[in-house]
Curated annotation (Swiss-Prot):
CDD domains found in the cross-reference section: ALDH_F18-19_ProA-GPR
Function: Catalyzes the NADPH-dependent reduction of L-glutamate 5-phosphate into L-glutamate 5-semialdehyde and phosphate. The product spontaneously undergoes cyclization to form 1-pyrroline-5-carboxylate.
Pathway recorded for this protein: Amino-acid biosynthesis; L-proline biosynthesis; L-glutamate 5-semialdehyde from L-glutamate: step 2/2
Enzyme class: oxidoreductase
Gene3D superfamilies with a match to the protein in the record: Aldehyde Dehydrogenase, Chain A, domain 1 (3.40.605.10), Aldehyde Dehydrogenase, Chain A, domain 2 (3.40.309.10)
Record's keyword annotation contains Transcription: no
EC number(s) recorded for this UniProt protein: 1.2.1.41
UniProt entry tagged with the keyword Zinc: no
Source organism superkingdom: Bacteria
Protein name as it appears in the record: Gamma-glutamyl phosphate reductase
One GO BP annotation of this record: L-proline biosynthetic process
Residue ranges crossing the lipid bilayer per the database entry: none
Length: 421
């Protein structure tokens, strides 16, 4: 009980500090926010040896816990990935500042001039699992949008997140911004998550970033509004009019480039007319690359294909595994996606413009692609600098959540002694 009380008191203090920081951060100048992000990027690069040392502790911890290869890949930092984090941070710094942007403006016959302008959300709570880079992405995007943020990373990335967070705080300090603008929960105790979900007085929105278990827990127990980032059950439909060269290139990239990210392809749907030719070539190429293919009855006749079970449809592997089945036509493909998908990202490979238009119009996923790798389902690749997650719900934000999506708006109404009749 005493431990629970101490966690509750700690989270209450963190929440109060965040609320106070948010009050001043909402009016912080563009120049100060830019300076804080650029400075943080410089500190990360300067302190990369210490950050990699901290990450080595997390890797050892993850190995002892028996984490899967996919989870270990998400956890791993090296110099190249740190360079990517620094580049992303600088990119966010250079983005247009969304705060104060006039979204719409109009005049009423009554003489009123009305503007709808972007405003910060306030305090954002981000709960995530093993990826240490989320510490930087979430901190940077929230700061850019004038929000304070409370970060609760996974126990596996505890040391890495701490080291990266210290660089973000140094950036805030250098720019004379409140250090409480970006806070990291300093404990692995899971009670901190439960506390965050009920902090309605200090947290304005919660963003869960992780697997089905984490997101489900947050959606069930949160009393604070939630931006849901569901698992990426990503489908690629190979149409009868697909180009062979493009298809092979896109499928291989979508599945094998990085299997542990939410935009990795998890299920292939192959039109029956191209199954004996292009479909078979794709399956064999995947297996040659070391991918385990779990196929339906038709595909399991190909040597090396494992027969799929009911559990393989609608599953996020995050590994060198893909489910695959033959479909009768585009309607059959879309029906499968509606049944087993997660409204994250889905793709059609075709040269038939009409089929592409139907697929992109009729499917209701947050991101729908045509002839492009699903690994592009990423805020950085969308020109947002970074993302805090891919929102799969329909309220407020959808798709990659960048700085602009971390704002609300208010109406500024001006008159000249104007009264209502």
């Amino acid at each position: 009980m005493k431990d629970m009380d101490s966690v509750s008191a700690m989270m209450s203090q963190i929440g109060q500090r965040a609320k106070e920081a948010a009050a001043s951060l909402g009016f912080a100048s563009v120049e100060r926010k830019h300076a804080a992000l650029i400075s943080a990027a410089e500190h990360i690069w300067t302190q990369r040896a210490a950050i990699l040392e901290a990450n080595a502790k997390d890797i050892a911890y993850g190995r002892d816990k028996g984490l899967s290869d996919a989870m270990m890949d998400r956890l791993l930092l090296d110099e190249e990935r740190l360079r990517g984090i620094v580049t992303s941070l600088r990119s966010v710094a250079e983005q247009a500042d969304p705060v104060g942007e006039v979204i719409a403006a109009w005049d009423q016959p009554t003489g009123l001039h009305i503007e709808r302008v972007r405003t910060p959300l306030g305090v954002i709570g981000v709960i995530y699992e093993s990826r240490p880079n989320v510490t930087v992405d979430a901190g940077a995007l929230c700061l850019k949008a004038g929000n304070a943020v409370i970060l609760r990373g996974g126990s596996e990335s505890f040391h890495s997140s701490k080291a990266l967070h210290a660089c973000l705080v140094q950036g805030l300090r250098d720019a004379n911004l409140p250090e409480a603008a970006i806070q990291l929960v300093p404990t692995r105790d899971r009670a901190a998550v439960s506390e965050m979900l009920t902090m309605t007085d200090t947290i304005d929105v919660i963003v869960p970033r992780g697997g089905k278990g984490l997101v489900g827990l947050v959606q069930r127990e949160a009393r604070v509004p939630v931006f849901a980032h569901l698992e990426g059950i990503v489908h690629i439909y190979i149409d009868a009019a697909a180009d062979a060269e493009k298809t092979l290139k896109v499928v291989m990239n979508a599945k094998t480039r990085r299997t542990g990210i939410c935009g990795a392809a998890e299920c292939l749907l192959i039109h029956k007319d191209v199954m004996p030719t292009l479909g078979a070539d794709v399956i064999k190429e995947l297996m040659r690359a070391g991918v385990e293919v779990r196929g339906d009855e038709t595909l399991s006749a190909i040597q090396g294909v494992v027969k799929a079970t009911a559990d393989d449809w609608g599953r996020e592997y995050l590994d060198m595994i893909v489910a695959a089945r033959v479909v009768d036509d585009i309607d059959d493909a879309m029906a499968h996606i509606r049944t087993h998908g997660s409204n994250h990202t889905d793709c059609i490979l075709t040269e038939d413009a009409r089929a592409a238009r139907r697929f992109m119009t009729e499917l209701d996923s947050a991101i729908v692609m045509h002839n492009a790798s699903t690994q592009f389902a990423d805020g950085g690749e969308f020109g947002m600098g970074a993302e805090i997650g891919i929102a799969t719900g329909k309220m407020h934000a959808r798709g990659p959540v960048g700085a602009a999506q971390l704002t609300s708006f208010k109406y500024l109404v001006s008159g000249d002694g104007t009264t209502r009749a």
